[in-house]
Amino acid sequence: MPEYCLLCHASASGGICRDCLDDLCRSAVAGSQSCPRCGGIGDGISPCGGCQRKPPPFEKLWSSLHYEPPVSGLLHEFKHLRQIALKRLLAELMAALPPPWLHNAGIDGILAVPLSRERLVERGFNQCGELALLLSARYGLPLLPEDTVFRRPAPPQSTLPYARRKKNVAGLFRVAGDVKKRNLLLIDDVATTNATLAELSRMLKQAGAGNLYCWTLAQAKMQKS
């Protein structure tokens, strides 16, 4: 990482200065205004109406930041322009705004949301895996092997309208590793409709996993159109 802030270019270690980090933290996703189950709009205490009607297959979802500039730009450079050195900065942003339940949820392993083999070859790395590796080392939680879950090829969720996203992920994952009774932390980069995390959680539960928790770098808003 450069010895200057990537946002304001002031002298800094780790790619971000304290002032910019504080500014980002002030614009973080407010847990007091979010559903504690799915991360959507809520009162921060009780599950939202949607979760009460149909609880998701994971216990809780937490997003550290909103998917908006400068976070969206940094993530684009990381994923699509292959600026892999940004992984440390992005993991640091997540660690600056961790889930409030992280240390008391009984989590015994971390699993990165996998890419399909084709997408992995195309991109050269799994952005979620890179973040998960750093978070695993930071919190002393074992990272499950990449071949724990396989993902079939499918159009990227970001290219699809809201109505097609749930159908697009149906049957997307196949669990190959032993996850029985494991309480897992799933790491993803962006949560929008939560369809991918919900489908992955559903398949893990079918394979015998215990409680599942989700942590994403950012949360994006999407119109249901």
Identify what each model region corresponds to.
Residues 1-188, 192-225:
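Glycine-rich phosphate/pyrophosphate-handling loop used in enzymes and phosphotransfer proteins
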